[in-house]
Amino acid sequence: LGVAPSATLYPIVSGCSAWPPAGGWQLHSKLAIAGGAVGMNASWTSGEGTAHGYQASERTHDLMVRDGDFDTPAAEPFVVVFSAGNSGPGASTLTAPKEAKNPIVTASGVNFRAGSIDNISGFSSRGPAVDGRLGPTIAAPGESIASTKRIAGAASCATSIAGTGNRYALCSGTSMAAPHVSGAVVQLTDWWRTLNAGATPSPAMLKALLVNGAVDMGTADIPNANEGWGRVLTPSSMGEGVLREYRDQSTVFNATGEQQEITVGIPDPLQPLKITLVWTDAAGA
């Protein structure tokens, strides 16, 4: 059923012969926005290799998160969830364009079928980015995931699951992990709209919710270059059982040097305090 079984999927550029698309990478977000989508799952690579650094494709995807349709006068924020790539376990093996700043980049963890859910997959691409920034953003199960299987052409998954008519198989890869996070984004968007009179959370808020609720997988203290900020845990992101305060773009800065000071009261000094600050950054040069 997936993480968000009631969500509406909107396939875009399926079977496109040109890569990147003839209309540029932003064709993805433009078509998705036209279909009413809040974001996209991007379980693919641009084909520009690993340790690509920050170049044109990374810059374009940073722009897409800030504004998914360059051709309209108003900015239309758009969530991009990427798979980290399957070039691990070496350092700085994120596949392009996953060294962009604004997308949510997903590492793969082991599924219960394959071992401990708190182990990172050996194949999962690692950070850091070439310029030293942290990557990936977060992790999700991506190993031995029950998924639909191609019924023609080369198979990319393991042996079919018995009793499924050769239509389902156990598949592994960060391409399996990223949809878990995309499903969490859908759940968090629906939850946020319910609490905020239908308002859609910004891409930065959604990333903040995911990061704040993530749990350490035990490979090293988070954040780290294997799992980012940890394994996604949606109930924790929703703040179940703890006091929470959220601020989503309530103050807009208009000039360099502007500041905002926020005072937070701590009701129980014996309990941990976790603060997450995320912003959708301007694209680099």
Regions found by a protein language model. Name each.
Residues 57-77:
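Catalytic-core regions built around general acid/base machinery
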